[in-house]
Amino acid sequence: MTDNTDMEKLDRATTPTPIPNEAPPTSEPSESKPEEAEDESKYPHGLKLAAIILSNMVAMFLVALDRTIIATAIPRITDDFNALGDISWYASAYLITSSATQLLWGRIFTFYPTKTVYLVAIFFFELGSLLCGVAPNSVAFIIGRAIAGAGSAGIYSGSTILITTVTPLSKRAGYVGMMGAVFGIASVIAPLIGGAFTDHVTWRWCFYINLPVGGAAVACLILLFPKFPVNEPVSVKQQIKQLDPWGNLVFLPGVICLILALQWGGEKYAWDSGRIVALLVLACVLLLVFIGIQIWQQENATVPPRLFKIRNVWLGTIFAFCLGSVLIVFLIALPIWFQGIRGTDAITSGIDTLPLVLSLVFGAIVSGGVINGVGWFNPVFFSSVIFMSVGGGLITTFVVDTPTRTWIGYQIILGLGIGQGMQLASLGTQVAVKQSDVPTGVSLMFFAQSLGGSVLVCVAQAVFNNELRSRLTSFDGIDVARIIGTGATQLRHVIPADRLAEVLVEYNAALRSYFYVGLAAACFAVLPSLGIEWKNVKGQEFVH
């Protein structure tokens, strides 16, 4: 898609002056027109590049670890703090600040040096981890989780932004794929590490571990990350204006209300309760006001509206939303199937999902290598949605006695699809926008991916509960409410032994409706993948 001359002039006339950051190249070609081969001599090479990338991977590893390491530590934490009622906040505090600050970090990365902002994000993450480790009570622990969540959002998007700063476009896909692989590996081993610390040392080491490892990464980045030319500084007033304070003033509480409604709805409170309805209404109002402010602010907006005139941006946002939905829905539903239908415990069900996660890692690495080799990322989009749709569809055929080789194979197919697509929306955005817009574009993709998982998993849970209720109401002597409120691992303890087999058949059928929501998201992802603009990243520098 190519903007006309008048629009290009308008963009240049209305673009705010950046404050100290890596100075973007002076040329601004049209969105679709490639230039000559990129000069790779300006980027770090050899051991220096390897050390920077390794430090970046370590930071991403810690963030991924922190997301799930707490799962096996929560029982011991609640024992120490005598705060069983706070369990939901241990996850919610992290998720709320991570989601709410994602776009703000993108804006900060746009106007300040990548190195400085990335180190600040790591600082917040480390500070939150330290507070969690030394927390004397549950309130302090929750505050620490909130601070760490805010820092994790900056690291999550910053890790990709850092790669765009130190690597040429032609080699970027491989490094981005490696980041996806690191995230997958950390997600697999996090519960195991958390369990080991909790059982053999103390749960506090789940958070202390971030300090020395993260500190080493920080030292490496401080010493080795290259210096780039910076633009002339502007006034403090202009800096504040460029960070869109009015937009963030309504966006942050809007996202907080939405996440709380999604976290509490159907669990702590009924969906039609006054609290949930009020939160949803308030979230809608605040987010609509945010959209209005973005249109009003234009270039000073958190997400400049002109970005949505670029096909790869708005289609990439939809694709990222779908991908995040598929990932989270199946990551939650599969352990429920293993625990509820096959009768495994929580740890064993985690091991049983290894085929999905390991194939996801493999898919992320291979897709990066393929894009580096051939230059085109569009075929990988197609491959991703095909594998996701086929794998998701096959998983919906699970029955009570599905053999081991079958559920392993189906997970591998799904994992390959998700892994291939993990970083595609981000990469498609990078080649379609100006270099100065890359931080905003990348943060937007990650926000959409996170939001997709949060929204669709609630939809899937509601569909599952309704389906299960409708299937079990005709069973005499069965307490439907108790079954729905019971965790999957305890399912066999609340069902009479003589009715277990027939109830499991209905439970499996209801759980397939959970899978259908993930399958629907995978199939819908076909549409944006078909519309993504064809661009060859090999040996060319596109838009700056």
Swiss-Prot record:
Q: Which domain of life is it from?
A: Eukaryota
Major localization listed first in the record, in broad terms: membrane
Free-text disruption phenotype from the record: Leads to pink mycelia in young cultures which turn red in older cultures, suggesting a delayed production of aurofusarin.
Q: Where does the record place it?
A: Cell membrane
Query: What CDD domains would the database entry show?
Result: MFS_Azr1_MDR_like (cd17502)
Induction trigger: Expression is regulated by the aurofusarin biosynthesis cluster-specific transcription factor aurR1/GIP2.
Q: From the record, give the transmembrane residue ranges.
A: 45-65, 89-111, 116-136, 146-166, 177-197, 205-225, 246-266, 276-296, 318-338, 357-377, 380-400, 407-427, 444-464, 514-534
Biased-composition ranges, Pro residues, are: 17-27
Record: glycosylation sites: N300
Q: In which pathway does it act?
A: Pigment biosynthesis
Keyword vocabulary terms for this entry: Cell membrane, Glycoprotein, Membrane, Transmembrane, Transmembrane helix, Transport
- Chain spans, region Disordered: 1-42
Q: Does the keyword Hydrolase apply?
A: no
Q: What GO annotations for molecular function exist for this entry? A: transmembrane transporter activity
GO CC terms in record: plasma membrane
Q: Is the keyword Isomerase assigned to this protein?
A: no
- A Pfam family that this protein carries is MFS_1
Q: Which Gene3D superfamilies match?
A: MFS general substrate transporter like domains
> What segments bear the compositional bias annotation Basic and acidic residues?
1-12, 30-42
What is the role of this chain?
Answer: Rubrofusarin-specific efflux pump; part of the gene cluster that mediates the biosynthesis of aurofusarin, a red mycelium pigment which is acting as a mycotoxin. The first step is performed by the polyketide synthase which condenses one acetyl-CoA and 6 malonyl-CoA units to form the first intermediate, the cyclic heptaketide and yellow pigment YWA1. The C2 hydroxyl group in the pyrone ring of YWA1 is probably formed during ring closure by an aldol-type cyclization reaction.
Protein family per UniProt: Belongs to the major facilitator superfamily. TCR/Tet family.
Protein's name in the database: Rubrofusarin-specific efflux pump aurT
